[in-house]
């Protein structure tokens, strides 16, 4: 898929799982190119009832994508929802072509989810490979309905490489119960992720968490049981948390902010 002259898309899309303004599922061999002199721009609304929903791509496994500006008024789904990419699972490595970046542009727009929502990327994991015979659903993380704890898929292996997200800018508002971040909602525990020179929000931008989103079903409004998340490392008692951050909602030890 590519653009040579006018790299602009506008639509109102509805679906279930794997819904995106450009592609619902972008596999590891796919190529999205833009040879015009203008940034790829997506506008409209993307509304879905399921998982992996993004303003540009629902589920991405490709290692390279073009720069993009997402100017949608709404991106909504159940889990793994991002202003640009819902679930980013590139194979081997991940770059934005020509040193570019992803930006979301409408300050009055919003990203809505029950869990795992990011202004740019909902969920991020660098895969070593995409095993044959494994379904797309099996590659996605699961969330325990009782504890709210997110568990990365064991049907694929995490790559040893590093993902660097540089100069990304989010202007969309975020509405979710748990795992919500201005740039990334949640990063896989083993994926080495560096986020540098990222910007989240304008004066109009607000982070809404903890079951405050009137459009979702409040599936995780009780938050994440922190003791279950921490294992034996800390004792939080019966405390729950939303896991929300201006840049990343759930930052693992392999996550670096610069």
Language-model features, listed with the residues they occupy:
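Surface-exposed loop/turn motifs in large extracellular/passenger domains
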Residues: 1-258
């Amino acid at each position: 898929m590519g653009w040579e002259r006018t790299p602009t898309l506008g639509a109102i899309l509805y679906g279930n799982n794997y819904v995106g303004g450009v592609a619902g599922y972008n596999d590891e061999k796919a190529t999205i190119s833009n040879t015009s002199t203008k940034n790829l721009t997506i506008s409209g609304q993307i509304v879905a009832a399921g998982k992996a929903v993004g303003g540009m791509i629902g589920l991405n496994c490709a290692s390279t994508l073009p720069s993009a500006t997402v100017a949608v008024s709404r991106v909504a789904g159940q889990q793994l929802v991002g202003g640009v990419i819902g679930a980013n699972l590139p194979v081997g490595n991940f770059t934005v072509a020509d040193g570019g970046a992803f930006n979301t542009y409408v300050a009055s727009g919003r990203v809505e989810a029950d869990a795992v929502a990011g202004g740019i990327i909902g969920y991020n994991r660098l895969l070593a490979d995409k095993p044959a015979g494994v379904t797309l659903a099996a590659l996605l993380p699961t969330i325990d309905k009782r504890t709210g704890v997110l568990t990365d898929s064991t049907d694929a292996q995490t790559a040893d490489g590093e993902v660097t997200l540089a100069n990304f800018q989010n202007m969309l508002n975020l509405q979710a119960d748990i795992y919500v971040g201005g740039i990334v909602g949640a990063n896989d525990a083993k994926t080495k992720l560096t986020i540098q020179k990222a910007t989240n929000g304008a004066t109009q931008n607000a982070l809404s968490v903890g079951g405050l989103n009137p459009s979702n079903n409040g599936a995780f409004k009780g938050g994440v049981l922190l003791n279950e998340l921490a294992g034996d490392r800390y004792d939080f008692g019966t405390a729950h948390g939303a896991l929300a951050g201006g840049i990343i909602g759930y930052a693992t030890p392999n996550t670096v902010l610069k």
